[in-house]
Amino acid sequence: MSFATDHATRWVGLLNSDTAAAVDMYADDLVYDDHADSDHVVDTAITKAELEPRLAPFANNDSGNGVGIHNFTATEAFELAGIHGNPAVVILWDWTGEGMATYHGVPVDGRTLNTRGITWHQLDSDGKIARETTYWNDTPVLQELRIPILTPEYWVEGFNPSTLVGT
């Protein structure tokens, strides 16, 4: 395995199972941004104490508490040139959530949710995650929950933007 694949496999494994060990992968001086379809300000953690509650739901193993059982799978990982000679890793991942009561406040009604995302890690000189930026593709999840989000295919020949205008 490559360095990037090893890092990604360890990271998703700990996200799925051990919050304390996952938090330990991060540097004390950190910036964690988890972007979905919400304001980034509420999603930015700069201390391990702020990070821990953001990661904790992913390691939940109680199928009856409404938090859900989450599973991340790293599908691809690439090492990139980082800053100050330290590596960066970009991770493409799949996520499944089962047994969740709500997703961003929307009732899940027993559905198993799935999406994909991408995470970038800038590592420090000790190999700890100093900066993380994560992007979730929330659109298919919210559509699965019957939220009316349009995803027009603008690139298709003959697309008519007037079809998006309400009558």
Task: Go through each PLM region and give its residues.
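C-terminal and inter-domain tail/linker signature
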Residues: M1-T167
